[in-house]
Amino acid sequence: MKLEKLVGDRFKERPADCQVDSHALMIRGGYMKNVANGIYSSYMPLKRITRKIEQIIREEMDAIDGQEVQFPVVMPASLWQESGRYDSIGKELLRFTDRNGAQMVLGMTHEEAAVQLVREYGQSYAKYPFMIYQIQTKFRDEARPRAGLIRVREF
């Protein structure tokens, strides 16, 4: 596809709000756009790069018998309460009540879900060893998003 057909504006000047060179280059090149503080839209060049990296990770993990899983974005708060991290993590963890009154969290990590999987699946020694991995977008209500894609809210 020709460059002029790609969605996303390209700039000659460095954006004033960019602190890191790589961040400035991606904005200038039309790879992404800042939608809100610490939240970016990825356009086709960056999506292609991301897909290629994910493909390499999948190939390498599959080669060593890794099993790709996908945990839910929204999890019951009880998983986080059981681990003790529900109260220890501050405002970065988004908490809400669903329409049925259940306490839920928007998972910024998925260790709790992984532990639940291992606890339920790994009841017998015969099932070990096994390896799981996931590639997924997460959200953390970062207090001070900065440095381009290094410290963002959605990652």
In which residue ranges do the predicted regions lie?
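TRNA-recognition modules of translation machinery and tRNA-sensing kinases, especially anticodon-binding
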Residues: 1-155
